[in-house]
Amino acid sequence: MRSPVTPGAAIAALARGPILAALLPAAVFANGLDDFLAFNSATKTATARFEQQVFDRSGKAVETASGTFTFARPGKFRWTYDKPHKQVLVGDGTKLWIHDPDLNQVTVKRMEGAISSTPAALLAGRDDITALFTLKDAGSSDGLAWVEASPRAQDTGFERVRLGLKGKSLAAMELHDQLGGRTLLRFSDLKANAPVAPQSFVFTPPQGADVIEDAPKKQG
């Protein structure tokens, strides 16, 4: 099975603090929810590297992947898997493009509904994140303050998402799906509000690629 689509989005190495930080009591860390809301409000663009691990319901690691991501609010992102298989996901604000070079295939979905209640919305979605997710503090561990986000919509492919913050910077994301599986993303070299080229969110299918586009919803 290929790497799951995660805006998102949503990875090199998780940015951890010095060893002393791991020894400090949880009370020393700032409120995770406050930190996430501050990050969400202040960060309009970002770039980072990521490492991804996929675990089955028994907790066994079944897949690893790595790559980079870029986003610009609202609704634009580029999520690139470099290893073990090349895959590119581009959200241009209107459409979501998923390119699988090995299959010479491009899948096109409407952005509306594709990321509105998915992990991508936590990174590249609109500022009013509480309209899409129920958020709550989830304690501190591994030197990070955690927030749990549960989608308000019922038809998402995941049950909840945990976000790990170090200060007001996102360091990790953990997705729990409906079947008991778990996907852990660890971020590094995250640059908030870095200049991002508009071309990053433009995708043109390669010549000769098989393009599969979702049919628009019927009216009425």
Region spans (language model):
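N-terminal secretory signal peptides that target proteins for export/translocation
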Residues: 1-13
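N-terminal leader/targeting segments and the immediate start of mature chains
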Residues: 2, 26-62, 205-220
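Short, solvent-exposed helix-to-loop capping segments enriched in aromatics
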Residues: 40, 115-130
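Solvent-exposed strand-loop boundary residues in beta-sheet-rich modules
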Residues: 58, 102-104, 179
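An acidic-aromatic
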Residues: 66-118, 183
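Gly/Pro-enriched, hydrophobic low-complexity segments
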Residues: 107, 130-218
